Amino acid sequence: MVKISFQPAVAGVKAEKADKAAASGPASASAPAAEILLTPAREERPPRHRSRKGGSVGGVCYLSMGMVVLLMGLVFASVYIYRYFFLAQLARDNFFHCGVLYEDSLSSQIRTRLELEEDVKIYLEENYERINVPVPQFGGGDPADIIHDFQRGLTAYHDISLDKCYVIELNTTIVLPPRNFWELLMNVKRGTYLPQTYIIQEEMVVTEHVRDKEALGSFIYHLCNGKDTYRLRRRATRRRINKRGAKNCNAIRHFENTFVVETLICGVV
């Protein structure tokens, strides 16, 4: 605390005050010196910067960015693993090279035991099957590529020997759906062949030439594009017959079930 005192004024002022004091009388006493007490001002301190709050916000931002980068890395790694490992494994699981032993009661009265091999590719998501039948070792049919398109409800046969395509409505009583066919082949994947089975025969006849192949769907279009393509009409499905009822027919033997099917395409142009 600072004490400030005011002393009496200069001589002129003192004389005036003396005259006034004499006029007022002796009763009046001399006034004491005026004093003012001043409290010293507080020391001004520079404002504190709230560095902690700003620093914490920046730290959260950096942490968030780091988490985003980490998550993006995990996503890209997952996509890579899915594409190059899972899909490759799935493709291997959907591809089958298999065969079946069956008794041939169609070619002769004496039942002979034959072997049929084929490569099967099943597309579960697209809901179609693709079958490749190589040249049979002991005759009994032509090599062929077959597509069963369950979305379109169509079957296409590409007779490799004739280099022609034939299209007909899908026969779901003979052809197993992709999921069921896949389960069947997975169950017998440990072995090389399916259990010994029998053969049935279906007969078809050529009806008309197909010009607009794009209307058949993309799968059949890619199979038959650039080839003469014809529509078929089904005549009959028979089992264990000893004599073929039609001449001028081409046979394709294949299986999409627990039995073998011989498809006769008659009236070939």
From Swiss-Prot:
Question: What cystine pairs are annotated?
Answer: C165-C224
Query: Topology with regard to the membrane?
Result: Single-pass type II membrane protein
What the entry lists under InterPro entries is as follows:
BRICHOS_dom (IPR007084), ITM2 (IPR040145)
Record keywords, A-Z? Cell membrane, Cleavage on pair of basic residues, Disulfide bond, Glycoprotein, Lysosome, Membrane, Phosphoprotein, Signal-anchor, Transmembrane, Transmembrane helix
Q: Which GO terms describe its biological process?
A: negative regulation of amyloid precursor protein biosynthetic process; negative regulation of neuron projection development; neuron differentiation; positive regulation of extrinsic apoptotic signaling pathway
Does Cell membrane count among this protein's keywords?
Answer: yes
PROSITE patterns hit by this protein:
BRICHOS
- List the Pfam families: BRICHOS
- Record-annotated BRICHOS domain positions: 138-232
List the residue(s) that the UniProt entry marks as the site Cleavage. Answer: K243, R244
* Gene Ontology molecular function terms on file: amyloid-beta binding; ATP binding
Q: How is it modified after translation?
A: Type I membrane-bound, as well as soluble, furin has a pre-eminent role in ITM2C proteolytic processing. PCSK7 and PCSK5 may also be involved although to a lesser extent. The soluble form of PCSK7 is incapable of processing ITM2C. Fails to undergo shedding by ADAM10 and intramembrane cleavage by SPPL2B.
Locate the transmembrane regions by residue number: 57-77
Q: Name one GO cellular component term.
A: lysosome
Going by the UniProt annotation, this protein carries glycans at N171
| Keyword Membrane belongs to the record | yes
Subcellular location per the Swiss-Prot or TrEMBL entry: Lysosome membrane; Cell membrane
Post-translational modification Phosphothreonine, affected residues: T39
Quote the function comment for this protein. Negative regulator of amyloid-beta peptide production. May inhibit the processing of APP by blocking its access to alpha- and beta-secretase. Binding to the beta-secretase-cleaved APP C-terminal fragment is negligible, suggesting that ITM2C is a poor gamma-secretase cleavage inhibitor. May play a role in TNF-induced cell death and neuronal differentiation.
Tell me how this protein assembles: Interacts with BACE1. Interacts with APP. Interacts with STMN2.
Regarding protein family, the annotation reads: Belongs to the ITM2 family.
This one is known as: Integral membrane protein 2C
